[in-house]
From Swiss-Prot:
Any Gene Ontology CC annotation: interstitial matrix
Underlying gene: ADAMTSL4
Identification of the protein by name: ADAMTS-like protein 4
Tissue occurrence: Expressed in colon, heart, leukocyte, liver, lung, skeletal muscle, spleen, testis and placenta. Weaker expression in bone marrow, brain tissue, kidney and pancreas. Expression studies in fetal tissues reveal strong expression in heart, kidney, liver, lung and skeletal muscle, but weaker expression in fetal brain and skin.
Pfam families: ADAMTS_CR_3 (PF19236), ADAMTS_spacer1 (PF05986), PLAC (PF08686), TSP1_ADAMTS (PF19030), TSP_1 (PF00090)
Length: 1074
């Protein structure tokens, strides 16, 4: 029945829309009245002022401060002294200065001002109805974005309701004041509404010229959106003059089942014959917002107050609920007319704006929030750092069924530095408890970087975290070296009188200073700070080289030695925070001073700067109100006075929904989805698409829609209720024993599946479930056993106590020998060695034969033999004859046979022999030379040797005492004369000689090595003069004269044998020139 009652009204609405279709063709053929806009973009806005910095995030130590700003639409100034212009266009381009025109677009197509009811998405800003067209794919939306023209409906762009609907005819004589949530138009004092005989809207292009004349319109009633703030009881109903009964919208039963049907408001006839629209909860629909419309007239959406980004979701009047645009009040002369006052109540100013539901959100380039580090008072020493406190917060929470004492784990890099990684005390693993630490936590100890929102931010030179600004070459924060200026020169004036003379002034902000004398001089550089305070070389005192702080920086004073050929110098990195003066203490003429520094210079001021384009000053448009009766003529006004007539701007009605040329008559619409694949936790479902008619919105056969344009029914995640908790057991550990019975362990935790996946929950949630075992017995294989591999061996001795052994091994189940550790758990190992007793031993002395040689060639000598004590089992070693070690027995010492005896080969006879000494050095260091040795005749009688006269050995052949020798190849070398006699016979004297360098042919040369030159002088006769041989120094051989004669006193043997004779030789030797 509902379909039959609504169909006539639909036909009537189509007939009334035909004139508008013709008008649309004219508008499209002429100049465009629409704002070229791209989806997802708004007009250019301006940043509001920064709010004050918030308080520090930490009570002590280092924290973070925040501040923000909002993006606002450009304000429009009101100049009462200028005449009111015609109504400006509703596009952001209309705010540009005259002559500039709109911005260039990448596409010649433009978006319509109104949105057709067949689309669910109407523009760059989305309100409660913004998701009506989400079922369309991105490809379809992009293809039809520039072709469809949709009407702008209340609540479409973020406001959610229309705060005011103005009736053009009122039957009440006593108008009531509108509620706070309704927008009121109030006229100024002493001025009345002047209706226009022919209401017209005059949209203007960028250059201000009118383009198209629009037909008169009336306002319609729209119920508020459920997303907006609730209406008060007195504002929950809105009165409108009844013209015709609105046609109810038709919806498909399947769409209703899927929850996409927007319920229509209920209408009742109230007092005075007015309709009352009661607000009902609304849902988005592909057919737009259902609102009662007056038959024969098209609704005129009311302009809204622009809102910034920070005002979204605060209702039509911001936070306070009070309109900041012009208020509407009834005109006393015309009860049905409403005039606006240019007063904003508590916020009265020269700004002018109207509440428009189609006002877009402005877009601004740049950052809307800034953060900086803040330093509070140092935290108490006993208080842990913030990261330790955050880890300690998990001490009372079980992890893997156990409580731990958590401490920070900071041995991480990169993005993990801002994660809360904690390590249980005494364990060798760490856990990431949260993905980000609290804002203001240091990324790592001792570093300036701070964690904010899980990111490690470094402070820039401006103090803002993450700004990335660095000082340029001249110290400008975030500069590009464009303002850097190098100041340098040479001071070559000869100088004035002696003393301090100012030579250079260094301004504040100077960097990389270099001041140096060109050459060494007796002059000194001096430095003075503000007020003439001496810093370097002041008060006629010369300071040592070093570092000195002045002007906010550190100056390095250098005074090199004069040998380097450099003068004094002063240098500093800067920047200087105060100006400093450089002086010279003149003591001679100026050798020249070089100086240079870098400073940031401000941009040059042009003599005739180009004026900046003025901010567009738009006057408030004249808003015309339709009178309740016949229009009255406009009263004349005095020339030169400002007309403050106010009227409501008339807007073209939205075109009737129709299918654009070239678009299919039907489209695929998402009406729901299949059941979730999981009854609990996370699952998937598939969307359901139906073929819908664009004209009627009814379901069509699938063949009416293009098969290629059907969106893919891709699976989408769905979330059900949480699943029941369950015990989750980990993997069993390895068996505690490699063989034999052992135990295994595993971890057990209570888990529960939610929509986002499974996670650990407290074990109490699984208390009603049987708890699985966490330990179990295990046996990998049987252990090995000990096996005796051989019998006992023979005893190590033949008699007495000894040792015997056998082979014992660990054998596995397969009979192979295995490690002894596998038998450790079984019976003890059998012994592999033990003691043995072979009975008492019998002992006796055994000896060998006497040696065949006598120890002496003549006279009495000694013969030897071996004597041992032997038992019946083994022989005793040396020294065991009496003790019998190892046998427990011993041989009788009294019966031990002797092991030595005397022998004689007859009496000895004296013999003589020649004895030769060692060869001496070669007489020539190079070339051919000779070697000498000593030869003496020695008599032997038994073991006694005596040196005798060489005549006693004359019967024997004498060995040679001289032989030739060959040295190295001859080179120039040093030659010396014999030493001269000692200058003193005792108590020290000197000897001298001549030294010359001779070549191989015995001529003087200078090519001898100087380091090998022999000494020309030496000491001699250093003994005391009273020294005499003592009585104990005697000659013990009668042949001492021969020893002296043969020069054998150099040998220790002869020195001891012939002590007195050799002592006299030593007394005379220093005087011997040879």
């Amino acid at each position: 029945m509902e379909n039959w009652t609504g169909r006539p009204w639909l036909y009537l609405l189509l007939l009334l829309s035909l004139p508008q279709l013709c008008l649309d063709q004219e508008v499209l053929s002429g100049h465009s009245l629409q704002t070229p806009t791209e989806e997802g973009q708004g007009p250019e806005g301006v940043w509001g002022p920064w709010v004050q910095w918030a308080s520090c995030s930490q009570p002590c130590g280092v924290g973070v401060q925040r501040r923000s700003r909002t993006c606002q639409l450009p304000t429009v100034q009101l100049h009462p002294s200028l005449p009111l212009p015609p109504r400006p266009p509703r596009h952001p381009e209309a705010l540009l200065p005259r002559g500039q025109g709109p911005r260039p677009q990448t596409s010649p197509e433009t978006l319509p001002l109104y949105r057709t009811q067949s689309r669910g998405r109407g523009g760059p800003l989305r309100g409660p109805a913004s998701h009506l067209g989400r079922e369309e794919t991105q490809e379809i939306r992009a293809a039809r974005r520039s072709r469809l023209r949709d009407p702008i409906k209340p609540g479409m762009f973020g406001y959610g309701r229309v705060p005011f609907a103005l009736p053009l005819h009122r039957n009440r004589r006593h108008p009531r004041s509108p509620p706070r949530s309704e927008l009121s138009l109030i006229s100024s004092r002493g001025e009345e509404a002047i209706p226009s005989p022919t209401p017209r809207a005059e949209p203007f292009s960028a250059n201000g010229s009118p383009q198209t004349e629009l037909p008169p319109t009336e306002l319609s009633v729209h119920t508020p959106s459920p997303q907006a703030e609730p209406l008060s009881p007195e504002t929950a109903q809105t009165e409108v003059a009844p013209r015709t009964r609105p046609a109810p919208l038709r919806h498909h039963p399947r769409a209703q089942a899927s929850g996409t049907e927007p319920p229509s408001p209920t209408h009742s006839l109230g007092e005075g014959g007015f309709f009352r629209a009661s607000p009902q909860p609304r849902r988005p629909s592909s057919q737009g917002w259902a609102s009662p419309q007056v038959a024969g007239r098209r609704p005129d959406p009311f302009p809204s107050v622009p809102r910034g980004r920070g005002q979204q979701g605060q209702g039509p009047w911001g936070t306070g609920g009070t309109p900041h645009g012009p208020r509407l009040e009834p005109d006393p002369q015309h009860p049905g007319a409403w005039l606006p006052l240019l007063s904003n109540g508590p916020h009265a100013s020269s700004l002018w704006s109207l509440f428009a539901p189609s006002s877009p959100i402005p877009r601004c380039s740049g950052e809307s929030e800034q953060l900086r580090a803040c330093s509070q008072a140092p935290c108490p020493p006993e208080q842990p750092d913030p990261r330790a406190l955050q880890c300690a917060a998990f001490n009372s929470q079980e992890f893997m069924g156990q409580l731990y004492q958590w401490e920070p784990f900071t041995e991480v890099q990169g993005s993990q530095r801002c994660e809360l990684n904690c390590r249980p005390r005494g364990f060798r693993f760490y856990v990431r408890h949260t993905e980000k630490v609290q804002d203001g936590t240091l990324c790592q100890p001792g570093a300036p970087d701070i964690c904010v929102a899980g990111r490690c931010l470094s402070p820039g030179c401006d103090g803002i975290l993450g700004s990335g600004r660095r000082p340029d070459g001249c110290g400008v924060c975030g500069g590009d070296d464009s303002t850097c200026r190098l100041v340098s020169g040479n001071l070559t004036d000869r100088g004035g009188p002696l003393g301090y003379q100012k030579i250079l002034w260094i301004p504040a902000g100077a960097l990389r200073l270099q001041i140096a004398q060109l050459r060494p001089s007796s002059n000194y550089l001096a430095l003075r700070g503000p007020g003439g305070r001496s810093i370097i070389n002041g008060n006629w005192a010369v300071d040592p080289p070093g570092s000195y702080r002045a002007g906010g920086t550190v100056f390095r004073y250098n005074r090199p030695p004069r040998e380097e050929g450099k003068g004094e110098s002063l240098s500093a990195e800067g920047p200087t925070t105060q100006p400093v003066d450089v002086y010279m203490i003149f003591q001679e003429e100026n050798p020249g001073v070089f100086y240079q520094y870098v400073i940031s210079s401000p941009p040059p001021i042009l003599e005739n700067p180009t004026p900046e384009p003025p901010v567009p000053q738009l006057q408030p448009e004249i808003l015309r109100v339709e009178p309740p009766l016949a229009p009255a003529p406009r009263p004349a006004r005095t020339p030169g006075t400002l007309q403050r007539q106010v009227r409501i701007p008339q807007m073209p009605a939205p075109p009737h929904p129709r299918t654009p040329l070239g678009s299919p008559a039907a489209y695929w619409k998402r009406v729901g989805h299949s059941a979730c694949s999981a009854s609990c936790g996370k699952g998937v479902w598939r969307p359901i698409f139906l073929c819908i008619s664009r004209e009627s919105g009814e379901e069509l056969d699938e063949r009416s829609c293009a098969a290629g344009a059907r969106p893919p029914a891709s699976p989408e995640p769905c979330h059900g209720t949480p699943c029941p908790p369950y015990w989750e057991a980990g993997e069993w550990t390895s068996c505690s024993r490699s063989c034999g019975p052992g135990t295994q362990h595993r971890q057990l935790q209570c888990r529960q599946e939610f929509g986002g996946g499974g996670s650990s929950v407290p074990p109490e949630r699984c208390g009603h479930l049987p708890r699985p075992n966490i330990t179990q017995s295990c046996q990998l294989r049987l252990c090995g056993h000990w096996e005796v591999g051989s019998p006992w061996s023979q005893c190590s001795v033949r008699c007495g106590r000894g040792q015997r052994s056998r082979q014992v091994r660990c054998v596995g189940n397969n009979g192979d020998e295995v490690s002894e550790q596998e038998c450790a758990s079984g019976p003890p190992q059998p012994p592999s060695r033990e003691a043995c007793d072979m009975g008492p031993c019998t002992t006796a002395w055994f000896h060998s034969d006497w040696s065949s040689k006598c120890s002496a060639e003549c006279g009495t000598g000694i013969q030897r033999r071996s004597v041992v004590c032997l038992g019946s089992g083994a022989a005793l070693g040396p020294g065991q004859g009496e003790a019998g070690a190892g046998t427990g027995q011993s041989c009788p010492t009294g019966s031990r046979p002797p092991d030595m005896r005397a022998c004689s080969l007859g009496p000895c006879e004296r013999t003589w022999r020649w004895y030769t000494g060692p060869w001496g050095e070669c007489s020539s260091e190079c070339g051919s030379g000779t070697q000498r040795r000593d030869i003496i005749c020695v008599s032997k009688l038994g073991t006694e040797f005596n040196v005798t006269s060489p005549s006693n050995c004359s019967h024997l052949p004498r060995p040679p005492a001289l032989q030739p020798c060959q040295g190295q190849a001859c080179q120039d070398r040093w030659f010396s004369t014999p030493w001269s006699p000692c200058s003193r016979s005792c108590q020290g004297g000197t000897q001298t000689r001549e030294v010359q360098c001779l070549s191989t042919n015995q001529t003087l040369s200078t090519r001898c090595p100087p380091q090998l030159r022999p000494s020309r002088k030496r000491p001699c006769n250093s003994q005391p003069c009273s020294q005499r041989p003592d009585d104990q120094c005697k000659d013990s051989s009668p042949h001492c004269p021969l020893v002296v004669q043969a020069r054998l006193c150099v040998y220790p043997y002869y020195t001891a044998t012939c002590c007195r004779s050799c002592a006299h030789v030593l007394e005379r030797s220093p005087q011997d020139p040879s």
